[in-house]
Amino acid sequence: MARKGLVERWKKPKKFKTREYTRCKICGRTHSVYREFGVCRVCFRKMANEGKLPGVRKATW
């Protein structure tokens, strides 16, 4: 319940630019969010394994 309230509050426009912070567009997680994709590492890995991110493939060496 608390996370849902934070996500709703996060969507509102901020009074000052410095108060904005990155959140995952899917789950609302605040830590380890990739700016390029706008999702957190957990959602990124899940989407990459499902093939939903074009051009992203698992590294092998």
From Swiss-Prot:
GO terms of biological process kind: translation
Gene3D superfamilies: 30s Ribosomal Protein S14, Chain N
Any one Gene Ontology cellular component term annotated for this protein: cytoplasm
The organism's place on the tree of life at top rank: Bacteria
Keywords: Metal-binding, Ribonucleoprotein, Ribosomal protein, RNA-binding, rRNA-binding, Zinc
PROSITE patterns: RIBOSOMAL_S14 (PS00527)
Cofactor annotation: Zn(2+)
Annotated residues for binding of Zn(2+): C24, C27, C40, C43
Keyword Repressor: no
InterPro entries cross-referenced by the UniProt entry: Ribosomal_uS14 (IPR001209), Ribosomal_uS14_bact (IPR023053), Ribosomal_uS14_CS (IPR018271), Ribosomal_uS14_sf (IPR043140)
Known partners and oligomeric status: Part of the 30S ribosomal subunit. Contacts proteins S3 and S10.
Name listed for the protein in its UniProt record: Small ribosomal subunit protein uS14
Species the sequence originates in: Thermosipho melanesiensis (strain DSM 12029 / CIP 104789 / BI429)
